[in-house]
């Protein structure tokens, strides 16, 4: 579990209790019309306690009125506590994050190379700073010199230090993290108030935690039901007078509270907040509650092969020359094309070449390095005497053809052989002559087959996008268990895939980390960006994974579904409760005047007074009983949507009808001795 778990402590509970009383303010409760009605009823009951005959002759003792008042107060406090406790978890994490950036100083590098100590808040973008072992990095930036290990646990919760160095994919650093070895020179990329940590704090504190469309729709439904029940209660009073049935105002207030959907009304905000918090516990930042909720509607998941389905550290395992006489030349050419390649693949090619080549390989190569891009899909070096490139088969074949070169007859079979094993083939050319193929071995992550099977049962289709050729993609897709794949996929192709799926009415989720992924992340309904990715990718996405683990998208989608299921399950339970309470209480109230109603008093409640008190107590206790479910969410198993629906109707629908009858009867058996 991550570091947020430590916030389940006594201090949090005490703070939530304090906030429960603060939220009694009518200005606070007006945001929740259901609980607002309960508080208005509580205030009217308090008026009746002070002035018993203000609404006519009172037929209830002051002690009975005080009992109703206390139960109504406790009901509101329980509802407020559930929301305050959920909010408190986020605030506690925000306080911890804020501590990571407090009272920081920086060692600013002057133009003459001298150092000057300044406050971290004075740093400007573009300035250079030096951070040494044991010091906290004062601002977001990029490493321009040095190599060191950095402890990012204050931000990500991951205890293992990570290596940061200039160049490559690991040169970005976050303000508030700790250098645990050596030193770094960093170019500042953000100023005070705009850092990644500042944005995290704003997100965690819920600055943008507005109600989601589904939540608003449900609130509208519940408010409408509340108004309907209010109308029923108001019309009940003249009907009771006509039937010569005495129904004191306090009992009508209590009856109203029992019948309106107070259970889900008291828990709805907590469910939404807790859903965002569960995502945070997985070290994923949600920019809004809407993002988490949309995750629950996702039915198509676009996944990159490298890093998501496979481990991503493809390793060169073999050199396959077009003929054995070319082996030595192939090794040297592969080495030269990779010597300035900082990717894991490039480094593995250099290692393999050194292991296999018995003669001395060239060390200092004076030339122009051409890095890999998504468009060219090749990398290499051009010198005065020679040009050497390695890259994807199609790209290399097209390049050789454009320059009127020859294509060896067996080059295609060599590539197919590698692809059929699930590997990635890279063709190596020297001066437009094909020398052979590099076999990059890729390994599928453990447990993915089972997880994809579970997603399929939940109605989610998985689509693998990869730059590999169709044969390699098909082999990996079959082994991993994904539903479909898109081979030789470029960044713009991802956008087309997403738009095509959305045009069919699907809700699409995807992951990305590069600037070239930003348009697709913005187009997708759910975009999960990696913390190690570019700023543009993180701005385009609506979720950010602090662990930079693309596989996390699967967990986030499950949390979104859990949020929707929890809200639906507790709404079903609450409405079923109201129906049960209606048939439990009304006969007990009417049977003294209408003897025919006695047959409907199936629970044999002892008296109208005890029936009302018992129902009110049950109404308050059920909110407390359901807080753990609202916070943790209902269990999500790999069942089909139909199976989940049936299970929820049996557990929360039927259970919502049965539990009130049993609960109210048990409470009535105790209350009858005091009323």
Curated annotation (Swiss-Prot):
Stretches that traverse the bilayer? 34-54, 65-85, 216-236, 245-265, 569-591, 611-631, 644-664
Active-site residues, record numbering mapped to chain: 304 (4-aspartylphosphate intermediate)
What residues does Mg(2+) bind to?
A: 513, 517
> What topology in the membrane does the UniProt record assign?
Multi-pass membrane protein
Q: Which GO molecular function entries does the Swiss-Prot or TrEMBL record give?
A: ATP binding; ATP hydrolysis activity; magnesium ion binding; P-type potassium transmembrane transporter activity
Class of enzymatic activity (EC top level): translocase
Q: One cellular component GO annotation, for this chain's record?
A: plasma membrane
List where in the cell it is found. Answer: Cell membrane
Tell me the residue numbers annotated for binding ATP: 341, 345, 372-379, 390
- Where it mainly occurs, coarsely classed, is membrane
Q: Which UniProt keywords apply?
A: ATP-binding, Cell membrane, Ion transport, Magnesium, Membrane, Metal-binding, Nucleotide-binding, Phosphoprotein, Potassium, Potassium transport, Translocase, Transmembrane, Transmembrane helix, Transport
Q: What does this protein do?
A: Part of the high-affinity ATP-driven potassium transport (or Kdp) system, which catalyzes the hydrolysis of ATP coupled with the electrogenic transport of potassium into the cytoplasm. This subunit is responsible for energy coupling to the transport system and for the release of the potassium ions to the cytoplasm.
Protein name per its UniProtKB record: Potassium-transporting ATPase ATP-binding subunit
- Which species is the source of this protein? Staphylococcus aureus (strain Newman)
């Amino acid at each position: 579990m991550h570091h947020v778990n430590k916030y389940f402590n006594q201090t949090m509970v005490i703070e939530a209790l304090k906030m429960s009383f603060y939220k009694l303010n009518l200005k606070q409760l007006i945001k929740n019309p259901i609980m607002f009605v309960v508080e208005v009823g509580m205030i009217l009951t308090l008026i009746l306690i002070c002035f018993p005959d203000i609404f006519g002759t009172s037929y209830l003792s002051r002690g009975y009125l005080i009992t109703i008042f206390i139960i109504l107060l406790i009901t509101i406090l329980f509802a407020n506590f559930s929301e305050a406790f959920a909010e408190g978890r986020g605030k506690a994490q925000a306080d911890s994050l804020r501590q990571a950036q407090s009272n920081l100083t920086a060692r600013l590098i002057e133009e003459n190379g001298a150092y000057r100590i300044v406050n971290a808040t004075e740093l400007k973008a573009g300035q250079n700073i030096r951070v040494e072992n044991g010091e906290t990095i004062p601002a977001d930036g990029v490493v321009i010199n040095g190599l060191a290990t950095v402890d990012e646990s204050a931000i990500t919760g991951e205890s293992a230090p990570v290596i940061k160095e200039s160049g490559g994919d690991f040169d970005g650093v976050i303000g508030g993290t700790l250098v645990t070895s050596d030193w770094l020179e960093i170019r500042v990329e953000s100023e005070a108030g705009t850092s990644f940590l500042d944005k995290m704090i704003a997100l965690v504190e819920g600055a943008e935690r507005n109600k989601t469309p589904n939540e608003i729709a449900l609130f509208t439904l519940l408010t409408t039901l509340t108004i309907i029940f209010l109308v029923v209660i108001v019309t009940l009073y003249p009907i009771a007078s006509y039937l010569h049935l005495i129904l004191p105002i306090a009992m009508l207030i209590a009856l109203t509270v029992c019948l309106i959907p107070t259970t889900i009304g008291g828990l709805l905000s907590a469910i939404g907040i807790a859903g965002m918090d569960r995502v945070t516990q997985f070290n994923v930042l949600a920019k809004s509650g809407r993002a988490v909720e949309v995750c629950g509607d996702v039915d198509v998941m676009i996944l990159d092969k490298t890093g998501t389905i496979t481990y991503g550290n493809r390793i060169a395992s073999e050199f396959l020359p077009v003929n054995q006489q070319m082996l030595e030349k192939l090794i040297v050419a592969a080495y030269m094309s990779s010597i300035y390649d900082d990717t894991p693949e490039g480094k593995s090619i250099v290692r393999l070449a050194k292991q296999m080549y018995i003669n001395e390989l060239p060390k200092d190569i004076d030339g122009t390095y051409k890095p890999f891009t998504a468009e060219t899909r090749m990398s290499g070096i051009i010198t005065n005497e020679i040009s050497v490139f390695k890259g994807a088969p199609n790209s290399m074949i097209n390049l050789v053809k454009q320059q009127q070169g020859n294509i060896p007859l067996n080059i295609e079979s060599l590539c197919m052989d590698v692809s059929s094993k699930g590997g990635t083939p890279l063709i190596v050319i020297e001066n437009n002559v094909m020398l052979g193929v590099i076999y990059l071995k890729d390994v599928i992550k453990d447990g993915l087959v089972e997880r994809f099977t579970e997603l399929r049962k939940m109605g989610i289709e998985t689509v693998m996008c990869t730059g590999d050729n169709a044969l390699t993609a098909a082999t990996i897709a079959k082994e991993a268990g994904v539903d479909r794949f898109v081979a030789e996929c470029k960044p713009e192709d991802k956008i087309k895939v997403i738009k095509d799926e959305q045009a069919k009415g699907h809700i699409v989720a995807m992951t990305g980390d590069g600037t070239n992924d930003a348009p697709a992340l913005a187009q997708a309904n759910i975009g999960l960006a990696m913390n190690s990715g570019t700023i543009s990718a993180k701005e385009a996405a609506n979720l950010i994974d602090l662990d930079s683990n693309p596989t996390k998208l699967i967990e986030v989608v499950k949390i979104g579904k859990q949020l929707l299921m929890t809200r639906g399950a507790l709404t079903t339970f609450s409405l079923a409760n109201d129906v049960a309470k209606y048939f439990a209480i009304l006969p007990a109230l009417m049977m003294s005047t209408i003897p025919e109603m006695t047959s409907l008093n199936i629970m044999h409640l002892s008296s109208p007074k005890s029936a009302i008190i018992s129902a009110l107590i049950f109404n308050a206790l059920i909110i407390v009983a359901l807080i753990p479910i609202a916070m943790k969410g209902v269990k999500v198993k790999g069942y089909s949507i139909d199976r989940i629906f049936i299970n929820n109707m049996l557990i929360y629908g039927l259970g919502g009808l049965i539990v009130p009858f049993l609960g109210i009867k048990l409470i009535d058996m105790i209350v009858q001795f005091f009323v």
